[in-house]
Amino acid sequence: MSRAEGTWGEALVADYLRGRSYRLVAHSYHCRFGEIDLIAWDGDTLCFVEVKTRTNTQMGLPREYVTAGKQARLRKTALFYLSSHDLDCPTRFDVAEVYAAVPGDPEACIEYLEDAFQ
């Protein structure tokens, strides 16, 4: 998928989270360690969300692309975010899978995996 398609998937997941009373605090957060697609509060837990948008599963499930290396970069980036914002709170790493025939597909489906990795 293109960057524009990925951005569309991230916006879709942001709306999904808002609809479930999450409070979004960052979108496409970047630092020297990497990027986190979405950062949101779920009650008193700060969630770091990786979004994967796909049109099919021929090459595997989207969650399978959150490799051990990607997880390590996400953890480092999250630690930097917590430190730079002086936060000491419960955290969670979630993965959101967006399935859509094409970007903008009104039939798009989101599979949201809470606590997808530690």
Predicted regions and their residues:
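Domain-level recognition of nuclease-like catalytic cores that cleave nucleotide substrates
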Residues: 84-118
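Conserved catalytic cores of phosphodiester-cleaving nucleases, focusing on short active-site segments
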Residues: 36-57, 74
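Basic, glycine-rich
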Residues: 29-30, 100
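Mg2+/Mn2+-dependent nuclease catalytic core
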Residues: 55-77, 83
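Residue-level signal for inorganic ion chemistry
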Residues: 17, 74, 93
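Acidic-basic catalytic patches of nuclease active cores, encompassing PD-(D/E)XK
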Residues: 1-27
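Short acidic/glycine-enriched loop/turn segments that link adjacent beta-strands
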Residues: 32-34
